[in-house]
């Protein structure tokens, strides 16, 4: 069985490709992660998002600890073939390990001299409640 579709992706020197995760329907950008070949293949096979965790050095099935899995509707490759876009349904409405809907919850306001980052999205569920009793308590 040929998997030439995997070869079309321009993997970086570490065998990874950046992945943008967008919510189907709202079009909110939920998160940014990386995949290796195995993660992309498992995502296609399972219909759920699987990433490569650079900190844990292993595959990471999104939601494996929190239950907040991502059902994949569509996978797109950008024009340079070096970035992937996943369009997903976010189960539980929480994509971020901080308990927020999306990881992009800090907004820059101000100017170059006195600007700062401000939290603009609420915590929907306390991360300690999400990950309570999970081995290692590693927030995704």
Swiss-Prot record:
Residue numbers binding Zn(2+): 79, 96, 103
Any coiled-coil regions, as ranges: none
Assigned GO CC terms: cytoplasm
Keywords: Amino-acid biosynthesis, Cytoplasm, Histidine biosynthesis, Hydrolase, Magnesium, Metal-binding, Zinc
Pfam families: PRA-CH
Keyword Ribonucleoprotein on entry: no
Cofactor(s) demanded: Mg(2+); Zn(2+)
Single biological process term from Gene Ontology: L-histidine biosynthetic process
Subunit structure: Homodimer.
Name of this chain's protein: Phosphoribosyl-AMP cyclohydrolase
């Amino acid at each position: 069985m040929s998997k030439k579709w995997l070869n079309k992706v321009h993997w970086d020197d570490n065998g990874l490709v950046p992945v943008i995760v967008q919510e189907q329907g709202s079009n909110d950008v939920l998160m940014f992660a990386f995949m290796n070949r195995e993660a992309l293949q498992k995502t296609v096979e399972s219909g759920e998002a699987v990433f490569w965790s650079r900190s844990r050095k292993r595959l990471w099935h999104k939601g494996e600890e929190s239950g907040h899995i991502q059902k994949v509707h569509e996978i797109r490759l950008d024009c340079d073939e070096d970035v992937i876009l996943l369009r997903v349904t976010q189960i539980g409405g929480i994509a971020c390990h901080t308990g927020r809907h999306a990881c992009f919850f800090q907004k820059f306001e101000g100017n170059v001299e006195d600007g700062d980052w401000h939290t603009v999205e609420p915590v929907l569920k306390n991360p300690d409640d999400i990950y309570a009793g999970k081995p290692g308590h590693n927030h995704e």
